[in-house]
Amino acid sequence: MSQKRLVLATKNQGKVREFRSLLAGAGFEIVGLDPDAPEVSETGDTFEENALIKARAASALTGLPALAEDSGIVVDALGGEPGVHSARWVPGSDEDRVRALLARMAEVPAERRTARYVSVIAVVLPSGREELFRGELEGRLAEAPRGTGGFGYDPIFVVADGRTVAEMALEEKNGISHRSRALARCLERLPALLEEG
């Protein structure tokens, strides 16, 4: 059986490699966007809207079925912030964003420090058919960063066993992450979706 070609709506080759690894053995050839492809503005108010914006643009540009992901951290005590703005909420590095979030949460008691990582994967076919797949990881925010693994908010995102995501091995993180949960749901439907066109 030949592999089905999918375009991942990103120019980031690291993300392309990650998705190739996550989809290894599933029968898909994953390609990224050309570095010269036009930038797409993520103007949506939800993870779903932003994932669809990116997937629609990638499918229209390439004529291929497209996969796009949007993700972030949702903090209950902050009314859902930073949400869709997680990667650009505060200018600077991941560490700058972690410091800013901890500063905003400084007076929030432990029982109100609940948060979740959210990942939404959009699949858009050249026919115009669209489907969304959502994965979440519940947790709470630590009072200080711990661990050296991961990226983004991982050093302050505490899972059920009391460790931060940054204290976990990559394989462990991938086994429970919001992204792996969304991707698992996507993989359940993707072969049939591609057949249906």
UniProtKB/Swiss-Prot annotation:
Catalytic site: D70
Molecular functions (GO terms): dITP diphosphatase activity; ITP diphosphatase activity; metal ion binding; nucleotide binding; ribonucleoside triphosphate phosphatase activity; XTP diphosphatase activity
Sorted UniProt keywords: Hydrolase, Magnesium, Metal-binding, Nucleotide metabolism, Nucleotide-binding
Entry's Gene Ontology cellular component terms: cytosol
Binding site for substrate: T10, K11, N12, Q13, G14, K15, S71, F151, G152, Y153, D154, K173, H178, R179
Cofactor(s) listed in the protein's UniProt record: Mg(2+)
Membrane spanning residue stretches: none
Annotated signal sequence range: none
GO biological process: nucleotide metabolic process; purine nucleoside triphosphate catabolic process
CDD domains, per database record: HAM1
InterPro entries in the record: dITP/XTP_pyrophosphatase, ITPase-like_fam, RdgB/HAM1
Disulfide bridges in this chain: none
EC number: 3.6.1.66
The keyword rRNA processing is assigned to this record: no
Record bears the keyword Metal-binding: yes
Cofactor note: Binds 1 Mg(2+) ion per subunit.
Positions that bind Mg(2+): D70
Main EC class the enzyme belongs to: hydrolase
Catalytic reaction list: XTP + H2O = XMP + diphosphate + H(+); dITP + H2O = dIMP + diphosphate + H(+); ITP + H2O = IMP + diphosphate + H(+)
Top-rank taxon, per record: Bacteria
Subunit structure: Homodimer.
Family: Belongs to the HAM1 NTPase family.
Function: Pyrophosphatase that catalyzes the hydrolysis of nucleoside triphosphates to their monophosphate derivatives, with a high preference for the non-canonical purine nucleotides XTP (xanthosine triphosphate), dITP (deoxyinosine triphosphate) and ITP. Seems to function as a house-cleaning enzyme that removes non-canonical purine nucleotides from the nucleotide pool, thus preventing their incorporation into DNA/RNA and avoiding chromosomal lesions.
Protein name: dITP/XTP pyrophosphatase
Source species: Symbiobacterium thermophilum (strain DSM 24528 / JCM 14929 / IAM 14863 / T)
Taxonomic lineage of the native organism: Bacteria, Bacillati, Bacillota, Clostridia, Eubacteriales
